[in-house]
Amino acid sequence: MGLQMSHELPVPPAAAADPKAVEIARIWASGGAQHVSLATEIWDDPAAWGLMLVDLARHVANGYEQAQGRDREDVLRRIRTGFDAEWKSPTDVATGGLVE
């Protein structure tokens, strides 16, 4: 059984209602760094993670639009700018290993 955190986000209703739903990623901000837990075995082709990341960016843009009234396309452009900048000149190095 995992640690229950007070700052944990809620499970989306559709996922909670689906007995076949699988969590694929968790990301925490802690101590000035990101810490992740990933279900890397979920897809055979790593390109599927690229599709998921684009879908995630769209969900983030929708969230900014709904919560702050920001233009969805502007938000997506800012996300892409940040993604491209980090890809070109990483500000951090991914470390760590698989934890079971």
Segments predicted by a language model, with ranges:
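Solvent-exposed interaction surfaces and binding hotspots enriched for charged
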Residues: 2-100
